[in-house]
Amino acid sequence: MSKEKQLVIRPENELDLKEVYKAKNGRMKESFYEQELQKLHIELCKLQNWVKKYDKKIAILFEGRDAAGKGGTIKALKEHLNPRGCRTVALPKPSDVERTEWYFKRYISTLPSGGEIVFYDRSWYNRAGVERVMGFCSQEQYKEFITQVANLEHMLIASGTMIFKYFLDVGKDEQKRRILRRKTDPLRMWKLSSIDDKSLSLWNEYTEAFEKMFARTHTHFCPWILVNTNDKKRARLNIARDLLSKIDYEEKDQTRVCLLPDPHIVWQYSEYQHHNDDPTQEILRQFKEHKKAEKSQKKKDKKLQAKEQKESKKELAKSGKDSKQKELKVAKESKANQESKAKDS
């Protein structure tokens, strides 16, 4: 994995705010998002070619709150990948037989083979999140999981599997808005589950469970990467950047595309305490500051214009006065000349 430091100037930082974000809600514009995502898709295809060529194994775990955008992110990342070399794992609840077996058994068979990338739409960390909060596992089962998971991940990494763990976080109000939308949008109703409504009322319980999960399972060899997904488009671009920046594959465009992610969107759990703000609100604040600056500049320009007009009028008045005096002088001299000629004659 690349540890080289980069001086990062992202495309969104080079353009005018209005070209990248919507002034009404601070979220990324579709046009800019699609333009940047296309560049990242090309790099993801290069990554997949490298994975296939060298029989690499990559497992990408997506955990997070309900309606945080896990499925949509996976769909965006794998849109142009060869389906023969990548797949998505989204297991249903355990069967009666699976409940009697070692918890990790049903996940072992889903792990990537050589030359394969596997995306997990929720993973074995279900036990530390939804299963624990909703009471779907006992305290003994939870303790067994939490003491074994780091060792399992260490063994997988030692055997050549690259693991990336992303936790997608979303604000309480935004989560509520998305869940309500699922209830009314026929094209999104399939996403609605029986526990979605309960997750809204159990916000604090989930927060506590996730904090304990991070504290026990965030390791130097397999860290948790947290992502603010209040703006889904911004989140997806920066997840792709983060993933690509951590793998040294062939023909990588590290100077223009594979940049380090925006630290306001993506960060390691160890830096979690510094990221409590909604990035969309920061964009709205910048729009407000720009609007204020534009208004102030217009006011200054108006004053300057009025001053210039006043000075111009004074100049014109002075010029007119000088012209009149000159005309009087010429007339006086002409009269004097005429009188002199008359006298001589």
Model-derived regions, located:
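Glycine-rich phosphate-binding loop of ATP-dependent small-molecule kinases
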Residues: 1-345
